[in-house]
């Protein structure tokens, strides 16, 4: 074939010299240690630590007690994955074998052992157990 002939006639100029790669590896190893860690707080300078928000007490929830369609999708997907990986099922099975159907049944009966964390604009967050959230579109 013509492709095979082109391969054998290929100039060696198309390939990178192996010695150039070794130079790059050696340069990375010669970096001083003080560049990788900051002596003040022992944190890599490429990371920025954010202050953790504070939890809003359960009695002072600001957001609505309705589960959004996005939260519902995330809860169902997460719970279905857990069930598929062998997590114990929280409802009586009536012949269901599909993990997603089992997760839907658990959600309808409010037996999903998942807590939804809603972040607020001020950096704080609210934790809502799925049992406390109302499902709108069943």
From Swiss-Prot:
Subunit text: Component of the RNA polymerase I (Pol I), RNA polymerase II (Pol II) and RNA polymerase III (Pol III) complexes consisting of at least 13, 12 and 17 subunits, respectively.
Entry's Gene Ontology cellular component terms: RNA polymerase I complex; RNA polymerase II, core complex; RNA polymerase III complex
Protein name (database record): Probable DNA-directed RNA polymerases I, II, and III subunit RPABC2
Domain of life assignment: Eukaryota
Gene giving rise to this polypeptide: rpb-6
Function, in words: DNA-dependent RNA polymerases catalyze the transcription of DNA into RNA using the four ribonucleoside triphosphates as substrates. Common component of RNA polymerases I, II and III which synthesize ribosomal RNA precursors, mRNA precursors and many functional non-coding RNAs, and small RNAs, such as 5S rRNA and tRNAs, respectively. Pol II is the central component of the basal RNA polymerase II transcription machinery. Pols are composed of mobile elements that move relative to each other.
One Gene Ontology MF term: DNA-directed RNA polymerase activity
Region (Disordered): 1-46
